[in-house]
């Protein structure tokens, strides 16, 4: 009888000691440019940040229209879930929402796959191809790591980078947006390590 009790106690202690360690990082979706109707244009990735920092969705408005979403790892410890913070910068209005669990900053629309322009059903213009995404990152010139995919060699000039025409936004405007988001402390951009 005592042997059964001892085995039972050892089993319980074994289960209690063998629990998986709690992760000390949060994993979030990362998309530097998401159009509400096209999905993630810049290539979707993931980012990690130490707890208790949040995942974030930053909605960018032009006048009263939602123009873009930026998804990534948040930086402000003062943000509480469901709080919204509004920041005005140039002609854009930024609204930041945070959440406190892995991948909680989910997509607002289905993520489309790149297709050849001119193919049936491509009237909306699809997200950038792999080589265009690489050029997009280079054109922003923010020392961002390249997305995790294999692409064809990118041409030297950035003139061939064509964002979907429905965006109505230049690379210079995008760069200004990302520099503001990073310098304001809203978003942790994944800087490339030397």
UniProtKB/Swiss-Prot annotation:
Primary site of residence: secreted
Keyword Transcription tagged: no
Modification after translation (UniProt): N-glycosylated.
Sugar attachment sites: 63, 141
GO cellular component terms, semicolon-separated: external side of plasma membrane; extracellular region; protein-containing complex
Domain UPAR/Ly6, residue spans: 26-118
Location in or out of the cell: Secreted
Keywords in alphabetical order: Disulfide bond, Glycoprotein, Secreted, Signal
Disulphide bridges, residue numbers: 28-55, 31-40, 47-73, 81-98, 99-104
Magnesium among keywords: no
Signal peptide: 1-18
Assembly, per entry: Monomer.
Protein name: Lymphocyte antigen 6 complex locus protein G5b
Organism phylogeny: Eukaryota, Metazoa, Chordata, Craniata, Vertebrata
Gene label: Ly6g5b
